[in-house]
Curated annotation (Swiss-Prot):
Annotated GO biological process: cell division; cell wall organization; peptidoglycan biosynthetic process; regulation of cell shape
Protein name per the record: UDP-N-acetylenolpyruvoylglucosamine reductase
Pathway(s) it belongs to: Cell wall biogenesis; peptidoglycan biosynthesis
NCBIfam families with a match to the protein in the record: murB (TIGR00179), PRK00046.1 (NF000755)
Length: 334
């Protein structure tokens, strides 16, 4: 019989009541490596978490959960650019606010995204027309088995839509230690996204875009401090233009976005709503009423089985109606 000692409920935003053998908060590289070695000696699994804002635990974790709190921001000024070296345990939104306070602009579209900087390259986080890859210069990876730090240039990170080399070729013995971000001193607003087109390009400021996006996100997304969730549970599907065209011709109100190589991105939330699943629930797992892309832990009483069952129903319904298979954006931890 396995014994679990520590609740993970406050270490992940879905707030599922699961337990781990041990939870350790690390603030230095030395402590991180020491913890990994101890985990290896005890022959137990090792899982690194930031804010736990993109994960769903399906059961108790029979190993060490290590919470990365190695944080810090260093700014280097060049002639035409600002170069930022940011440690992985830094909260992403704290970084965005910090740069704006320092009059360094370019991250405002990525305001209020939960999680830490170390998670940003894994998912290639993005919102309102900007992705992490657009500002990334490099990613520093720490290999725990030999304590070596390897710098990976942005071009070699294989960034895609909510994807990267760190997701495709995950190495359990490595962690993202820090990232390099490059922002031009000559700032240009990026407001081509459908929800930002109400803003006037003339005289718009980074501060205004930041506050506008914060307002949008607060209006339509649940606060994880109050309602358990992991943000977008599904990716917006990217499909071939001819297939998308057939659906768009039938449904004139379908939001879509052109992608490279003749592909079209469709709104997963819209597809889910068209399957008449708005407010649908399984036990205490429920589709969020303001954004169908988000599954919530109602009253923080849902089980992971509830959430997985709800997700499977959604995938099945969308596949049947539109012949599109939704992919998970949330990382499932078994």
């Amino acid at each position: 019989m396995k014994t679990y000692y520590t609740s993970l409920k406050k270490f992940h935003t879905f707030k599922i009541n699961v337990f781990a053998k041990k939870i350790i908060i690390v603030k230095t590289i030395k402590t991180l490596i020491k913890t990994w070695k101890k985990c290896n000696q005890e022959n137990l699994p090792f899982l690194l978490l930031g804010k736990g804002s993109n994960v769903l635990f399906t059961k108790n974790y029979n190993g060490f959960v290590v919470v990365n709190r190695i944080s810090g921001i260093t700014i280097h000024e060049q002639k035409d650019y600002w170069l930022l070296h940011v440690k992985g345990g830094t909260k992403w939104n704290n970084l965005v606010k910090y740069t704006i306070q320092k009059k360094i602009y370019g991250l405002e579209n990525l305001a209020l995204i939960p999680g830490t900087v170390g998670a940003a390259p894994i998912q290639n986080i993005g919102a309102y027309g900007v992705e992490f890859k657009d500002v990334c210069q490099y990613v520093d990876v720490l290999y725990l088995n030999n304590s070596k730090i390897v710098r990976i240039n942005s071009n070699n990170c294989l960034f895609g839509y909510r994807d990267s080399i760190f997701k495709k070729k995950h190495n359990p013995n490595s962690i993202i230690l820090s990232v390099g971000i490059k922002l031009p001193k000559t700032w240009k607003p990026k407001i081509s996204h459908l929800e930002l087109q109400k803003l006037s390009f003339k005289n718009i400021t980074s501060h205004q875009i930041f506050h506008y996006i914060c307002k949008l996100r607060k209006k339509k997304l649940p606060n994880p401090k109050k309602i358990g969730n992991a943000g977008s549970f599904f990716k917006n599907p990217i499909i071939k233009k001819n297939k998308a065209h057939k659906i768009i011709c039938e449904y004139k109100d379908l939001p879509f976005y052109p992608e490279p190589h003749g592909m079209i991105k469709l709104s997963a939330g819209w597809l889910i709503e068209k399957c008449k699943l708005k407010n649908f629930s399984v036990g205490n797992a429920k589709i969020y009423h303001k954004q169908a892309l988000i599954l919530i832990n109602k009253n923080n009483l849902a089980t992971s089985k509830n959430i997985i069952k709800l997700a499977k129903i959604i995938i099945s319904k969308v596949k049947k109606k539109f012949d599109i298979t939704l992919e998970l954006e949330v990382q499932i931890i078994n």
